[in-house]
Structures are given as structure tokens and as C-alpha cells.
């Protein structure tokens, strides 16, 4: 009989497993704490469990971590791990330290089928979904390794963002139990406000998440019009912007925050003009297709990679774009790039993927031909003073 990997179970599933062993629910709670709060994988070391239970577990269960293929530490303290998930696939996980928090960026798939043109993961194609245990194992490894390295028993990771490799909402069956493990007070005890699911816009699953486990939501918007977003985020052809914004409004009815974060990767000459900033203001404002959408805009400097055919907007252009949004009444932040010296910044995670979607071949086609920005607009943007928008990290 194959041993059950206990990292696959949320507390309810672990309780059901313990009942199959003839044990009561409180034993599952004890076991859950040992695994997730103390990082213990050896049942023999779980001293407050009955010896009979430890013997049962030794024959029928295991806490199976992911094998670490590599670890890189950036000059700014960012840490990137490459984990082997079998079948020739590897996924990446990134820890971003800050003075007031520690954020872990977790992958949900080996590769990604969405194929956003500015994302290195999308250019790698898609192999498979990760299991709940493979998602949780990234947090388990990072939290307990960082504690050991820092010589502390206090929690190191305060925030989790599902912004690594993959589209989380296209792996919902594995994502949901993983979120419950993160939020459980007997597990990692994270606040719903501090766990963020980022999606390219899988509308039906946004509604499911609202019903099942509403956490903070970030939406990869990246364009103010369907015509442009169809090319940058191909999923838009199935779920256009108006449908996506309606789903965001519904989500806010149950969300732990009173706004949606819209992520907007700044691409030189593609989506960064003054006119497009004004279109974005209109899109989420009272006169937009679904009325006002309470939101924060997070502008993300593009992290170039050769296959994209795209380049990063200038600092001045980003500042000018941000200032127009701020002047229009939108809370706007500019993400500060972290870990780019180890390819751990936003959009750079690629891992190693056995592509089943032929994405690498499809991505070789030329990017969409975008009309150049008016030269006068270009000069004004490049000469613009620093905006008042704030900086954020991932």
C-alpha cells in the first residue's frame, strides 16, 4: 500500500485519515501542528502522540518534501528555490524579505497554459498541475528552512502570494485545500488579507473562490482594452474585460479587502501611453462598462527575456503613467523589482517544463504590431517629474 503524503491533507482530510486509523479528531490536530507549525517530518519525534499512533503512521503515512535542485540568494536578500516535481519538471518558489513582512511567492503548476506574452513561464508551455502537497511543500520547506537559518522559532513568512509559475485558478481542486492549510490556525495561521491569489481572469473560478475561500485577489489586467489584452493575455478572448470586472465586483461582496488589485506590466510602446492611462481610469471608473470597481493599480516594470520581443518602459514613462492614475483618483503603486539578479523577479520564473502545449513553438511568432506612441507624448513622459505613487514589492 502506498503511504499517504500528509502534506496533501487539510485538517478535515487529515481528521478523516486519522479516523480510518481508529483515532479521534484531536489526534489529527496534534499531528497537523507537528507537521506545519514545527516542521517535523519524523513521526517518532512527535512526542505527544501515542506510541500506537506513531507506529500506525510509520507504516501508512509520510511527510514528503520536495527535492531541492538549487537555491540562489540575491544581493537584496531574495531567495529562490528550484524544486523537482518529477517527470522532468521543476518549479520555482521565491521568498522576498522586507522589514515588516516576509512574502513567499508560490507556484501552482509546472508551466502555464495561459501564454501571456510578457511572462517567461508562459513561454515555457504547460506540463501539469501541482498537487495540494506540492503547493504546500513549497511553504513548508521555505518556512522551516528560513527559521533554522535565522535561528528562530517565530514565524518568518507572513504573506503568501500565488504568483509563481502557473494559473492558480486553473488548478482549483489542489489550490483550495492548500489555501485552507495556509489559513488554518493549527497550520500556518495566515490572515485571509495576507494570502493573495493572482489570476489572469478565469471568471467562473473567481466566483468559486468567493464562495469557498475568499482571500485577497489580484488580477493580471495589463491592458485597458480588449483588443490589446486579447494579444497580451490570450485568456481574454474567452473572458473579456467586462465579464472579468463584473466577477471582480461580485468577489468584493465576500473579499477580506475592500478592493481588487489590478496588476499592470509596463511594456514600452505597447500599453504605457498617456492615452492608455486615461483609458484605464475610465475602465474602472463610474463610466466604465460595469461602473466603478474599487481597486488598487500595481504597475510592474517588465523584466525582459529574449523570447518576448518586448522591452521595459522607462522609469520616466512609468512615473508619468502612475501620476496620471493618481491624479485621476486611483490608488497606485509601482512594484520595486526584487531578485532580478537571480531571475526571481516578476515574470522571470520559468523552471524546467516538459511542454505539452507547444507553447514554445507558438511563442516564436512575432508580437502584435502596436502603433507607436506619438513622439510628443513620448517626450513629455520622458521629461515627467517623479510621481507620488508609492513603491511596493511583489
From Swiss-Prot:
It catalyses: adenosine(2503) in 23S rRNA + 2 reduced [2Fe-2S]-[ferredoxin] + 2 S-adenosyl-L-methionine = 2-methyladenosine(2503) in 23S rRNA + 5'-deoxyadenosine + L-methionine + 2 oxidized [2Fe-2S]-[ferredoxin] + S-adenosyl-L-homocysteine; adenosine(37) in tRNA + 2 reduced [2Fe-2S]-[ferredoxin] + 2 S-adenosyl-L-methionine = 2-methyladenosine(37) in tRNA + 5'-deoxyadenosine + L-methionine + 2 oxidized [2Fe-2S]-[ferredoxin] + S-adenosyl-L-homocysteine. SUPFAM superfamilies: Radical SAM enzymes (SSF102114). [4Fe-4S] cluster binds at residues 112, 116, 119. It comes from the Bacteria. Residues 98-341 form the Radical SAM core domain. The keyword Disulfide bond applies. Keywords: 4Fe-4S, Cytoplasm, Disulfide bond, Iron, Iron-sulfur, Metal-binding, Methyltransferase, rRNA processing, S-adenosyl-L-methionine, Transferase, tRNA processing. One of its GO terms (biological process) is rRNA base methylation. S-adenosyl-L-methionine binds at residues 166-167, 198, 220-222, 303. Coiled coil: none annotated. One of its GO terms (molecular function) is tRNA (adenine(37)-C2)-methyltransferase activity. The active site is at 92 (proton acceptor), 346 (s-methylcysteine intermediate). Disulfide bonds join 105-346. It is found in: Cytoplasm. Gene3D superfamilies: 1.10.150.530, Aldolase class I (3.20.20.70). Residues 374-394 are annotated as: Disordered. Its cofactor is [4Fe-4S] cluster. Pfam families: Radical_SAM (PF04055), RlmN_N (PF21016). Its EC number is 2.1.1.192. One of its GO terms (cellular component) is cytoplasm. Specifically methylates position 2 of adenine 2503 in 23S rRNA and position 2 of adenine 37 in tRNAs. m2A2503 modification seems to play a crucial role in the proofreading step occurring at the peptidyl transferase center and thus would serve to optimize ribosomal fidelity. Belongs to the radical SAM superfamily. RlmN family. This is Dual-specificity RNA methyltransferase RlmN.
Amino acid at each position: 500500500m502506498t503511504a499517504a503524503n500528509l502534506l496533501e491533507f487539510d485538517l478535515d482530510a487529515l481528521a478523516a485519515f486519522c479516523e480510518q486509523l481508529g483515532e479521534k479528531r484531536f489526534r489529527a490536530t496534534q499531528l497537523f501542528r507537528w507537521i506545519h507549525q514545527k516542521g517535523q517530518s519524523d513521526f517518532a519525534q512527535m512526542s505527544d502522540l501515542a506510541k500506537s499512533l506513531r507506529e500506525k503512521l510509520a507504516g501508512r503515512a509520510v511527510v514528503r518534501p520536495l527535492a531541492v535542485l538549487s537555491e540562489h540568494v540575491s544581493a537584496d536578500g531574495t531567495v529562490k528555490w528550484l524544486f523537482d516535481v518529477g517527470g522532468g519538471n521543476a518549479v520555482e518558489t521565491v521568498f522576498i524579505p522586507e522589514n515588516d513582512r516576509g512574502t513567499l511567492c508560490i507556484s501552482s503548476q509546472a508551466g502555464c497554459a495561459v501564454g501571456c506574452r510578457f511572462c517567461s513561464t508562459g513561454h515555457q508551455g504547460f506540463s501539469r498541475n501541482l498537487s495540494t502537497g506540492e503547493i504546500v511543500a513549497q511553504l513548508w520547506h521555505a518556512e522551516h528552512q528560513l527559521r533554522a537559518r535565522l535561528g528562530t522559532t517565530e514565524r518568518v513568512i507572513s504573506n503568501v502570494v500565488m504568483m509563481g509559475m502557473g494559473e492558480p485558478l486553473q488548478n482549483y481542486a489542489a489550490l483550495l485545500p492548500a489555501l485552507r492549510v495556509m489559513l488554518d490556525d493549527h497550520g500556518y495561521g495566515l490572515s485571509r488579507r495576507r494570502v493573495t491569489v493572482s489570476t489572469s481572469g478565469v471568471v467562473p473560478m473567481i466566483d468559486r473562490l468567493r464562495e469557498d475561500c475568499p482571500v485577497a485577489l489580484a488580477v493580471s489586467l495589463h491592458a485597458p482594452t480588449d483588443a490589446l489584452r486579447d494579444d497580451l493575455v490570450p485568456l481574454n478572448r474567452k473572458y473579456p474585460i467586462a465579464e472579468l470586472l463584473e466577477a471582480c465586483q461580485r468577489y468584493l461582496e465576500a473579499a477580506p479587502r475592500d478592493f481588487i488589485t489590478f496588476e499592470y506590466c509596463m511594456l514600452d510602446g505597447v500599453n504605457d501611453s498617456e492615452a492608455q492611462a486615461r483609458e484605464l481610469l475610465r475602465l474602472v471608473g463610474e463610466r466604465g462598462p460595469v461602473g466603478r470597481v474599487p481597486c488598487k493599480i500595481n504597475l510592474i516594470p517588465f523584466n525582459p527575456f529574449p523570447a518576448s520581443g518586448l522591452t521595459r518602459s522607462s522609469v520616466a514613462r512609468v512615473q508619468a503613467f502612475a501620476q496620471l492614475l493618481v491624479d485621476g483618483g486611483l490608488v497606485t503603486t509601482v512594484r520595486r523589482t526584487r531578485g532580478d539578479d537571480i531571475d526571481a523577479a516578476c515574470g522571470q520564473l520559468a523552471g524546467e517544463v516538459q511542454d505539452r502545449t507547444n507553447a514554445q513553438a507558438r511563442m516564436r511568432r512575432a508580437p502584435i504590431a502596436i502603433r507607436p506612441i506619438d513622439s510628443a507624448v513620448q517626450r513629455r513622459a520622458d521629461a515627467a517629474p517623479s510621481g507620488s505613487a508609492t513603491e511596493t514589492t511583489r
